[in-house]
């Protein structure tokens, strides 16, 4: 079954001009203190995916190296501070079921034994009670019983997909309750079914998960009202004092829409590291790391009456492997909420209370 992606005119109408994603190219490779080493990468990873992995740190350049069954990269982040922050946030993080090894580029890091993983037996699935997109989901294939070499392991990797942190109930319950005082609109989301057009705002690469806006007349009206209000308020809203920025702060920050330009958008502070804040852009379903001094105040409830424009979805059968789908319309059928979960203590996954349905989209045939 193939994608049914509409022409970009509708997304242009909502966002502006048509944007084209371009891969940054390296004029030459030279190790610098502003570069970060990213090791234990999948063999088939592209430069574009590496840049996306470090998108929160505004990477300038990437140099990918593949040696036999090993793949690693050096990424220029532009400053030593960003290198330190990237190491803190990404080292040890699971990426395509591989533990990333992130370090400075001063010397090649030693390969640790826990980085060499043999195929594991499938995790145990259990039925989750209720509905909610705070569930941890898994799609699993049987792993081979006999040991294989690392090259063969790359080809036989199990298709395991866990609901990302920002889509889980433990995160969203806190976010929505602190941002929106009136949650009566939640009932409408539970009732959404049938044929739909979804304007994709962000994806989780090589998984079935993505954030999208359900294209309706109501969405168009909400977008116009919200963006008009934020545009008028932006210059009047003061920048936040550094001491007031903490987890749970409602604020306004500049969101990058690629070639579409920039837009000030509602966001919620998830964490703070020195002079950097990790924020969730409410209306685009996107996490980003931005300077604390660039945040503006947006604590009045008047700015939080319009529900979030976007929500998470999961494809029933396919995965998203191309970034070209971002800012495009996907057409398909919303079949319901995700209703299965996985118990996997070793992988630090947890079943959490339901809140909203993680919409399951059945792709339309081409």
Swiss-Prot record:
Pfam families: RRM_1 (PF00076), TUDOR (PF00567). Gene3D superfamilies: 2.30.30.140, 2.40.50.90, 3.30.70.330. Keywords: Coiled coil, RNA-binding. The keyword RNA-binding applies. Residues 210-317 form the Tudor domain. This is Tudor domain-containing protein 10. CDD domains: RRM_TDRD10 (cd21617), Tudor_TDRD10 (cd20432). Residues 34-107 form the RRM domain. One of its GO terms (molecular function) is protein kinase A regulatory subunit binding. It comes from Homo sapiens (Human). One of its GO terms (cellular component) is mitochondrion. Residues 216-237 form a coiled coil. It comes from the Eukaryota.
């Amino acid at each position: 079954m193939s994608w049914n992606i509409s022409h970009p005119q509708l997304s242009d109408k909502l966002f502006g001009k048509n944007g084209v994603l371009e891969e940054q190219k390296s004029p030459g490779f030279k190790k610098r203190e502003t570069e970060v080493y990213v090791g234990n990468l999948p063999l088939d990873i592209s430069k574009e995916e590496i840049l996306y992995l470090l998108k929160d740190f505004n990477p300038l350049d990437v140099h990918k190296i593949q040696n036999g069954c090993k793949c690693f990269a050096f990424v220029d982040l532009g400053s030593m501070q960003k290198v330190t922050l990237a190491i803190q946030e990404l080292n040890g993080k699971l990426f395509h079921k591989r533990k990333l090894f992130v370090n400075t580029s001063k010397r090649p890091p030693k390969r640790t034994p826990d980085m060499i993983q043999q195929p594991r037996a499938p995790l145990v699935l259990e039925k989750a009670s209720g509905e909610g997109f705070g569930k941890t989901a898994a799609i699993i294939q049987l792993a081979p019983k006999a040991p294989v070499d690392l090259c063969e392991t790359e080809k036989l990797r199990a298709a395991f997909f866990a609901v990302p942190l920002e889509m889980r109930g433990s995160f969203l319950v806190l976010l929505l309750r602190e941002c929106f005082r009136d949650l009566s609109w939640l009932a409408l989301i539970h009732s959404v079914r049938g044929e739909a057009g979804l304007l994709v705002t962000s994806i989780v690469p090589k998984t079935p998960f993505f954030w999208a806006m359900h294209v309706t007349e109501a969405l168009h009206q909400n977008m116009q009202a919200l963006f008009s209000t934020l545009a008028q308020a932006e210059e009047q809203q003061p920048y936040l004092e550094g001491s007031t920025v903490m987890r749970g702060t409602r604020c306004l920050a500049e969101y990058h829409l690629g070639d579409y330009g920039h837009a000030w958008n509602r966001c919620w502070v998830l964490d703070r590291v020195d002079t950097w804040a990790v924020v969730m852009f409410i209306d685009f379903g996107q996490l980003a790391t931005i300077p604390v001094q660039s945040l503006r105040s947006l604590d009045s409830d008047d700015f939080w009456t319009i529900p979030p424009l976007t929500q998470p979805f999961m494809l029933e059968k396919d995965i998203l492997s191309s970034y070209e789908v971002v800012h495009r319309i996907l057409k398909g059928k919303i079949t319901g909420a995700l209703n299965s979960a996985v118990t996997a203590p070793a992988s630090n996954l947890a079943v959490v209370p339901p809140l909203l349905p993680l919409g399951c989209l059945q792709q339309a045939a081409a």
